[in-house]
Amino acid sequence: MADSGRRKRPRVGLALSGGAARAFAHLGVLRVLEAHIIPIDCIAGTSAGAIVGALLAAGVPVARIEDISRNLRWRDVGRMTLSRLGVQSNAPLEDWLRKHLPFTRFEDLPIPFAAVAADLHAGTPVTLSGTGDVPFAVRASCALPGWYIPVADKHGRQLVDGGLVANVPAAAARFLGADIVIAVDVNAEGAKFLGTPRTAFGVLLQSLMVVTRTVSGYQWQDADIIIQPKIGHIRWDELGRNDELRAAGEAAARHCLADIERLLASATQA
């Protein structure tokens, strides 16, 4: 017989937005959640948020994710291609993930995880989870259209960056069974301090940011807590500012910590 006095803890999901280099801010958020023993029962990630989410779901400690991210360069995630569908292939990202993930199958992950991509033809989100190859799914979620070639899945779909349709994957976290969703949106401030991008890659990144900001507001409704690091002054391509981004993530998470703890306490059922 079940103990009638036992209190049931709500299932907590984490939704990590895309944002290229800005995703380093997720690491600061994770550091605060870990320090305050906030439980994470499932994780959904889009684009660069899927990279961080996959590592965390595979059991890689936050400190280790920070260490390996310090050495990450654009050449680690893409290489030039002769394809007419893109300037580069992001197949190297798949190789990088296989090097750092202790588990590469969804069904083996210690924490349930979903990577969100976009179906290029249908214009709809594709939630990759449950079974299958994690590095492939994350690669698809990160395939910035126009720069990286689309990633074809076994169903014949052409998959591209999930930020086009679900940059804040709170709905995917609900799909994984979350009762409470903590979302981290690293693009909430947009690029209010930035001028015109100086490279073609920068133009594509900033164009995607415009699109994601438009749709992100609609996706917030699926989240209970929205953490918004103040990083509007940092471009998506500035990998060298990872320490600053992590610090901003920490500050934003601390700002929301009391609300998170209050929500967890009130949602716990007798």
Please name every model-derived segment:
Residues 1-46, 54-270:
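Patatin-like phospholipase
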